[in-house]
UniProtKB/Swiss-Prot annotation:
Molecular functions per Gene Ontology: pheromone receptor activity
Cytoplasmic topological segments: 41-49, 115-131, 212-238, 291-310
Positions glycosylated per UniProt: N159
Stated role: Putative pheromone receptor implicated in the regulation of social as well as reproductive behavior.
Tissue expression per record: Expressed in 1-4% of neurons of the vomeronasal organ. Only one pheromone receptor gene may be expressed in a particular neuron. Not expressed in the main olfactory epithelium.
Cystine crosslinks: C85-C172
Family named by the database record: Belongs to the G-protein coupled receptor 1 family.
Subcellular location: Cell membrane
UniProt keyword terms in alphabetical order: Cell membrane, Disulfide bond, G-protein coupled receptor, Glycoprotein, Membrane, Pheromone response, Receptor, Transducer, Transmembrane, Transmembrane helix
Name of this protein: Vomeronasal type-1 receptor 97
């Protein structure tokens, strides 16, 4: 894949990518400020608000970063130097790792919070925020340290076209690395992502079992008219399942597109599709949070009424 092929990528792909980034930035901004306001209001705030606010902030920064990278991919106006390339590529990789880590730990915290009193997870309910904060800091340090090789492998794109370089944008490229060096950096990253995806799978499986058991108990304890009402626990559980199912599907699809890109010599189209797929969760997940969280709707309603009264 060379830089000329990226410039001449189909216009519909470009429009889709920039639309996704714009919508995602707006949605994550709304979600972040909503939870930020709720954190300052003691009667509305919950411990999980801080983690959702951090996830939305991370996704917001991720989409801004990929927006800058995409602009350099399709609009060859000016050229970045090596320092700018290294900083943006490293920041993007770091924010992607933070997003995966925050999604996993938020899912685990949600699972512990919604678990019934008879569950073995009850003992972690009061300790979980502190433990999860510590785990998050641990994974952040890992991502910061293991991503430092990007400063060595990222350079400003040379003027001469070469098949040895892997073009990222019009200004930035990856230096070719040996198989042993590639394995040395990719193996820890694969293990780390497998661990986080495994935690997401386990906690999601637990929530499926909880939802199924809760539904069966409702059939025995209530009449049909009463059991049709959805409890807050069921609503929250379904929100988790929608988000995590969507996350896992996109993660698998992203890897399929990535290997397809590696298979074909001219993978400019696959490269753009991979970017769109890999950032779809950051764009769509805020809408799921906003639509299923009644507190946000009430907050916006109260703020609108205050503005109208003024």
């Amino acid at each position: 894949m060379n830089k000329d092929n990226i410039l001449h990528t189909d216009t519909n792909i470009k429009i889709t990518l920039f639309s996704e980034v714009s919508i995602g930035i707006s949605a994550n901004s709304a979600l972040f400020f909503s939870h930020l306001f709720m954190l300052f209001e003691k009667n509305r705030s919950k411990p999980i608000d801080l983690y959702i606010a951090f996830l939305s902030l991370t996704q917001l920064m991720l989409l801004i970063t990929i927006g800058l990278i995409a602009a350099d991919m399709f609009m060859s106006r000016g050229r970045w130097d090596s320092t700018t390339c290294q900083s943006l590529i490293y920041l993007h990789r770091l924010l992607r790792g933070f997003t995966l880590c925050a999604t996993c730990l938020l899912n685990v915290l949600w699972t512990i919070t919604l678990s019934p009193r008879s569950s073995c997870l009850t003992t972690f309910k009061h300790k979980s925020p502190h433990h999860i904060s510590g785990a998050f800091l641990f994974f952040c340090v890992l991502y910061i340290s293991f991503g430092s090789h990007l400063f060595l492998s990222t350079i400003a794109t040379p003027n001469l076209t070469s098949d040895n370089f892997m073009y990222v944008t019009q200004s930035c490229s990856f230096l070719p690395m040996s198989y042993s060096r590639t394995s040395m950096f990719s193996t820890p990253m694969a293990i780390r992502e497998a661990l986080l995806i495994g935690l997401i799978g386990l906690s999601s499986g637990y929530m499926v079992a909880f939802l199924w058991r809760h539904k069966n108990q409702a059939r025995h304890l209530h009449s049909t008219s009463l059991s049709s009402k959805v409890s807050p626990e069921q609503r929250a559980t379904r929100t988790i399942m929608i988000l995590m199912s969507f996350f896992v599907v996109l993660y698998i699809l992203e890897n399929v597109v990535f290997y397809s890109r590696m298979t074909f010599k001219d993978g400019s189209m696959f490269y753009c599709v991979q970017i769109i797929v890999s950032h779809s969760y950051a764009t769509i997940s805020p809408f799921v949070f906003i639509c299923t969280e009644k507190r946000i709707i009430k907050l916006w309603g109260s703020m609108s009424s205050r503005i109208v009264s003024i």
